[in-house]
């Protein structure tokens, strides 16, 4: 590992600050620069009982970072002329059907699936909300059903494609199935032969094979009495989150993403194709970075970033790249609830900012406020009525913008005290309709919040930057509607486990190694 130009003291201090809020059994962090792993930091253990230390070859479940790899596979088919991103996905999907809620819906395309705008529901059926891991997993050791069996009744399209952003594991599972149906090669084998193999990722796989099994970390959640191992499950919608990998292998992957599709071992995509994946393919508003093809777009200081996080019970992962600087960070933790509230994402962001010479992510406090616009901004904003396409954001019930203590604030109907009390909207420049909120307690640093207007100048919507969600303003509404209470009650149950980790019982874990 080449550590030249890396300020280890600053990196470890920033990591330590995150871990003081999000304790873990084990954490692995890799910094990629100049096409290789420039710095590695291992903290804690892969398995508490065995005392196995974290190292570069510890295997983690990378969860939804898998989606970026699935997107690479789709774009390989596009380069070969085997698929067209704007052709209906059903033209390539043989294993099961996509079923629109209304016959007049436009067809869902591969581009829609790659940007979470296909209208695919987050759960196969409402009863999945009551199942472990939302019905996405099956106990380890049991047969994993084929997607044809898993979606035997078809996969439902609940919103018209192209009209709404809603994060969907099932959409990326469908992309993986399309890769299999078009190539004629099982998806796991396809990734081994055409992505992992060319990039030298010898300790990565879609399934729990001999390539990954012996070095696999144990996943934990933090309970009031300490760390507890999670129930081990396999991911059924594999293209959405099933890959196992190591810090070393994911550093090789990041090097290829920063190297125009190639690293020192080989090439998986052409530079122009990869560049197109990083460009905006969905933006609810031009001020929101939005989505590329399989990647979230963002900003670190003046530097554009592309990234993806992953969440699975007991595991959290993050990949964040600053392509203009040829720099990337991968981070993996084997501790965390099935919610975004955990260490890997904040660690990756903090490390990248350190490498780029940036201070910690914070709102700008010296920007003058513009109260003249507050009156038209205040009110209730909702995701709107209709089918529950994505239960996680819909748990907000409604979002209220109001003036509290002489500041503009945003308040959500969700059982998180800070959000229910209200988060201050800090002005983010001269634009009176652009703000930032401070989210350090949620592992997200800051997030942009912008308001859009119709041609007549009336405020019609609010858009979030942390995920490209849009909330529509409800003129004259005094509350989010009677369904908000139900959403709030449902979210209280669903989020309860995700907040148990906030207990700050000390956990004895050995220190880090470089």
Regions found by a protein language model. Give the residues of each.
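Active-site-proximal loop and beta-strand segments within enzyme catalytic domains
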Residues: 9, 21, 33-36, 45-169, ...
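Short hydrophobic alpha-helical membrane-entry/anchor segments
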Residues: 494-506
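Well-ordered alpha-helical segments within folded domains of soluble proteins
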Residues: 70-71, 171-176, 251
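An acidic site on a long C-lobe helix of protein kinase domains
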Residues: 106-109, 171, 242, 246-249
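Hydrophobic aliphatic residues
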Residues: 93, 114-118, 199, 257, ...
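Intrinsically disordered, highly charged
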Residues: 2, 506-514
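Secretory-pathway/luminal and periplasmic proteins that interact with or process carbohydrate-rich
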Residues: 38-40, 96-105, 118-126, 188, ...
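Catalytic loop of the DD-peptidase/beta-lactamase superfamily, centered on the K-T-G motif
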Residues: 2-41, 134, 180-185, 189-193, ...
């Amino acid at each position: 590992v080449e550590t030249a130009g890396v300020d280890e003291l600053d990196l470890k201090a920033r990591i330590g600050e995150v871990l003081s809020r999000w304790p873990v059994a084990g954490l692995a962090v890799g910094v990629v620069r100049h096409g290789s792993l420039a710095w590695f930091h291992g903290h804690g253990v892969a398995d508490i009982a065995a005392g196995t230390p974290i190292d570069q070859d510890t295997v983690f479940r990378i969860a939804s970072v898998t989606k970026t790899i699935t997107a690479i596979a789709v774009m390989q088919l596009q380069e070969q002329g085997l698929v067209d991103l704007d052709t209906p996905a059903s033209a390539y999907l043989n294993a099961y059907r996509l079923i629109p809620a209304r016959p007049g819906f436009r067809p869902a395309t591969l581009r829609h699936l790659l940007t979470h705008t296909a209208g695919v529901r987050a759960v196969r059926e409402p009863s999945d909300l009551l199942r472990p891991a939302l019905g996405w997993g099956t106990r380890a050791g049991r047969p994993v059903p084929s997607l044809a069996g898993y979606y035997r009744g078809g996969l439902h399209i609940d919103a018209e494609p192209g009209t709404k952003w809603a994060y969907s594991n099932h959409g990326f599972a469908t992309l993986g199935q399309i890769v299999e149906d078009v190539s004629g090669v099982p998806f796991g084998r396809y990734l081994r032969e055409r992505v992992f193999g060319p990039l030298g990722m010898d300790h990565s796989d879609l399934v729990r094979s001999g390539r990954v099994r012996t070095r696999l970390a144990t996943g934990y959640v933090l309970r009031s009495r300490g760390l507890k191992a999670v129930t081990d499950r396999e991911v059924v919608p594999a293209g959405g989150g099933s890959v196992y990998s190591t810090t070393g292998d994911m550093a090789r992957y990041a090097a290829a993403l920063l190297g125009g599709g190639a690293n020192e071992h080989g090439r998986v995509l052409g530079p122009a194709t990869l560049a197109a994946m990083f460009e905006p393919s969905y933006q609810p508003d031009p001020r929101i970075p939005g989505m590329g093809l399989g990647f979230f777009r963002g900003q670190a200081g003046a530097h554009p970033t592309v990234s993806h996080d992953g969440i699975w019970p007991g595991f959290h992962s993050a990949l964040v790249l600053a392509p203009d600087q040829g720099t990337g960070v991968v981070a993996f933790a084997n501790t965390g609830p099935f919610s975004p509230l955990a260490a890997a994402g904040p660690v990756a962001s903090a490390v990248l900012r350190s490498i780029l010479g940036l201070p910690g992510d914070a709102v700008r406090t010296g920007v003058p406020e513009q109260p003249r616009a507050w009156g038209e901004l205040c009110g209730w904003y909702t995701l709107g009525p209709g089918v529950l396409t994505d239960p996680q954001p819909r748990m907000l019930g409604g979002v209220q913008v109001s003036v509290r203590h002489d500041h503009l604030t945003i308040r959500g109907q969700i059982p998180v005290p800070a959000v229910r009390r209200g988060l201050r909207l800090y002005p983010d420049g001269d634009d009176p309709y652009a703000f930032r909120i401070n989210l350090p307690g949620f592992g997200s640093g800051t997030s942009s919040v912008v308001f859009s207007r119709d041609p007549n100048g009336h405020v019609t919507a609010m858009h979030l930057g942390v995920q490209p969600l849009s909330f529509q303003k409800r003129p004259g509404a005094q509350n989010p509607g009677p369904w908000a209470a139900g959403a709030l009650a449902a979210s209280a149950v669903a989020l309860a486990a995700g907040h148990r980790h906030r207990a700050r019982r000390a956990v004895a874990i050995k220190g880090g190694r470089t």
